[in-house]
Amino acid sequence: MSTETKNYITPAGWQALKDELYQLVNKERPEIVQIVNWAAGNGDRSENGDYLYGKRRMREIDRRIRFLTKRLEAAVVVDPELREATDQVFFGATVGLLRDDGREQTVKIVGIDEIDTAQNKISWISPLARCLIKAREGDEVVLNTPEGREEIEILSVEYIKID
């Protein structure tokens, strides 16, 4: 995602990123620094597994800290609970669907850092979300996939808290 693209995120998603950053900066990184310092004092670093693993893990943590910091700086927090009631689908909507095969499904349209298929959280830039956005309750939308075309009916649109 480029820096010009807005990073829409729900309050819960923003808090999850913030919590992960706190955990890395205040817990994991200090522990790894301590291990690396201890291992460095054990002599030859070229064959010192604790030292080599610790340095590699510290690089991974530092990379993740930079990533999370940038994502939080670019975040545009959108609270679905504060949205005016509407039957139109936008970011943060919880949408009830009727799929082509007759099964009902509920999806929550969230930020790209919040995707969780087990909880039916889909990114606002996913193909399904793109065909739903701006449609209204009762509308039928068409989702084109590599497997073919699927018609989906929008059964409900709600703006409720997304955990």
Swiss-Prot record:
InterPro entries with a match to the protein in the record: GreA/GreB_C_sf (IPR036953), TF_GreA/GreB_CS (IPR018151), Tscrpt_elong_fac_GreA/B (IPR028624), Tscrpt_elong_fac_GreA/B_C (IPR001437), Tscrpt_elong_fac_GreA/B_fam (IPR023459), Tscrpt_elong_fac_GreA/B_N (IPR022691), Tscrpt_elong_fac_GreA/B_N_sf (IPR036805), Tscrpt_elong_fac_GreB (IPR006358)
Keywords: Coiled coil, DNA-binding, Transcription, Transcription regulation
Entry's Gene Ontology molecular function annotations: DNA binding; RNA polymerase binding
Domain of life of the organism encoding this protein: Bacteria
Keyword Ribonucleoprotein recorded: no
Keyword Signal: no
Coiled coil feature spans: 54-76
UniProt record, GO biological process: DNA-templated transcription elongation; regulation of DNA-templated transcription elongation
Cited Pfam families: GreA_GreB, GreA_GreB_N
Entry-linked PANTHER family: TRANSCRIPTION ELONGATION FACTOR GREA, TRANSCRIPTION ELONGATION FACTOR GREB
Function: Necessary for efficient RNA polymerase transcription elongation past template-encoded arresting sites. The arresting sites in DNA have the property of trapping a certain fraction of elongating RNA polymerases that pass through, resulting in locked ternary complexes. Cleavage of the nascent transcript by cleavage factors such as GreA or GreB allows the resumption of elongation from the new 3'terminus. GreB releases sequences of up to 9 nucleotides in length.
NCBIfam families: greB, PRK01885.1
Similarity-based family: Belongs to the GreA/GreB family. GreB subfamily.
Protein name: Transcription elongation factor GreB
Gene field: greB
